[in-house]
Curated annotation (Swiss-Prot):
The gene is era. Residues 124-127 are annotated as: G4. Residues 154-156 are annotated as: G5. This is GTPase Era. Residues 41-45 are annotated as: G2. It comes from Shigella flexneri serotype 5b (strain 8401). It is a peripheral membrane protein.
Amino acid sequence: MSIDKSYCGFIAIVGRPNVGKSTLLNKLLGQKISITSRKAQTTRHRIVGIHTEGAYQAIYVDTPGLHMEEKRAINRLMNKAASSSIGDVELVIFVVEGTRWTPDDEMVLNKLREGKAPVILAVNKVDNVQEKADLLPHLQFLASQMNFLDIVPISAETGLNVDTIAAIVRKHLPEATHHFPEDYITDCSQRFMASEIIREKLMRFLGAELPYSVTVEIERFVSNERGGYDINGLILVEREGQKKMVIGNKGAKIKTIGIEARKDMQEMFEAPVHLELWVKVKSGWADDERALRSLGYVDDL
């Protein structure tokens, strides 16, 4: 009697902020797990996304963007989280953007050169490159930087060549038992996912107006007798002016954020959601390591 083989491994998705790492993760999983927004630093936790297909289970670690600015406690912790996730994986997907190459990309590359894991280079947003003639020389430049396992031009947004990345990942998964049941897509708690959804809506509807000094704490997450969830979210900002910005004129902004967040939660939790949001000023939290620990920013380090 033959025992079927199974394959399982951890894959880190790394790159500087805003190159499309979260969008790629969501595409690889076939649904939204990691929050995506055009603002840098939207991913603050190492979210694990799990994709199981037959005998193959790929466990994706979505890192915060490695970036050079290390002044604030939150930035230092995010950089530490990103660096630590590179160290304990079977494979790394290094995401860069089109024909752009920055000192931050160089810094990530230097960290990868120190590691032992093979690296796939995903050149994202190739559909946005205006001068297509620039692409080939740039790919040749990238190929000369490191001995990459493969270099794949992709568009995480449209899905172009994402299946190629997935196929390379499957091919390099070691023989191992699966860590998670096959219907799992993330090991993050519903409470954590609720806070991420609210934070995404804050980023989306406040855009460049709102600095990164905003976080979300879920104060209450309980099942109700209607078969759904009652969720209370506390939005923490650093200044009174930011609080007014989040609330908006006559509460219009926070109402929109709440409506959109509730829709996403209901889709993710497959149950009705009653969501209430509050905004509170807590000055200096992004500089205070103790406050960051209490908000779960270092729970996995």
